[in-house]
């Protein structure tokens, strides 16, 4: 049976290098499942695969969207499944790698009946965001869908806006639409989770932020100033440095805040993944054990 190997884990854990080794061993391309790496021009701040890595193994869904493009987990589900179907005509195994929780769920179990948002609703919500601010939209979401309000990151503009749009468009709750029965896939799914001891993970995150700064993250953010209102830039690493360029924060403070916010995001990812009992967990250094496990289960 065709098998989709899903390599997941928190940001900074070491998915990229292991995904390359796995893809080479399996002789397959990589489907990126990091929602921010889909956007072009966010190479440094999202730790997107380098040009050399992209040459080493074929990737899908890296740098394919413009910053102002609207994109959702439901659209990713459609695009990824189309790509998977095409690739499975040529091979029996594929690798999907990333840490975007909702995008992984979209491919593995589907997002049922999420309505297409009309231009009227999208424009209305966008205008309210500009006029009233995120807090007003968050309170509206609390009224319409208190369950999702309780779990959503209240500072994540994209998720609050999308959930509110769905509520307004469907007349129901985003929670109900997300929690319907999983869709059945015509391929097997093998989930591999990567994790490290908490202190080790946090040290890697801190070091990676320092490395991003040394490789020009501030210059990347400066180039993106004309697009700063794009949802894609409401992302750790970018929003903090915009405040530096605005003269609100010193650089040292912003760098420390990026590290802290990245660590918080990693904890949220792990909390989400821990609810999935189908994940087999490994330390990233256990590369041979991971490869053996995959080969045993895709044979």
Regions found by a protein language model. Give the residues of each.
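Phosphate/pyrophosphate-binding catalytic cores of soluble transferases and nucleic-acid-acting enzymes
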Residues: 1-299
């Amino acid at each position: 049976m065709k098998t989709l190997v899903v390599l997941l884990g928190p940001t900074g854990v070491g998915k990229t290098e292991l995904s390359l080794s796995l893809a080479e061993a399996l002789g397959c391309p990589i489907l990126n499942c990091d929602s921010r790496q889909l956007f072009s021009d966010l190479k440094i701040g999202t730790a997107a695969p380098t040009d050399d890595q992209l040459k080493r193994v074929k990737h899908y869904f890296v740098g394919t969207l413009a910053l102002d493009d609207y994109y959702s987990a439901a659209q990713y589900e459609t695009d990824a499944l189309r790509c998977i179907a095409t690739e499975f005509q040529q091979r029996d195994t594929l690798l999907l790698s990333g840490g975007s929780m909702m995008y992984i769920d979209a491919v593995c179990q589907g997002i049922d009946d999420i309505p297409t948002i009309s231009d009227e609703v999208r424009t209305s919500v966008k205008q309210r965001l500009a006029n009233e601010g995120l807090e007003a939209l968050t309170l509206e979401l609390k009224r319409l869908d208190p369950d999702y309000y309780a779990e959503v990151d209240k500072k994540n503009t994209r998720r609050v806006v999308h959930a509110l749009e769905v509520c307004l468009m469907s007349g129901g709750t985003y929670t109900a639409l997300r929690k319907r029965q999983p869709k059945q896939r015509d391929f097997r799914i093998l989930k591999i989770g990567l994790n490290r001891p908490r202190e080790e993970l946090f040290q890697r995150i801190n070091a990676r932020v320092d490395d991003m700064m040394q490789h020009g993250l501030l210059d990347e953010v400066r180039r993106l100033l004309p697009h700063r209102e794009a949802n894609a830039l409401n992302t750790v690493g970018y929003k903090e440095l915009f405040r530096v360029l605005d003269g609100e924060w010193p650089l040292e403070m912003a760098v420390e805040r990026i590290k802290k916010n990245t660590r918080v995001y990693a904890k949220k990812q792990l909390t989400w993944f821990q609810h999935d009992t189908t994940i087999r967990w490994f330390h990233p250094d256990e590369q041979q054990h991971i490869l053996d496990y995959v080969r045993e289960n895709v044979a």
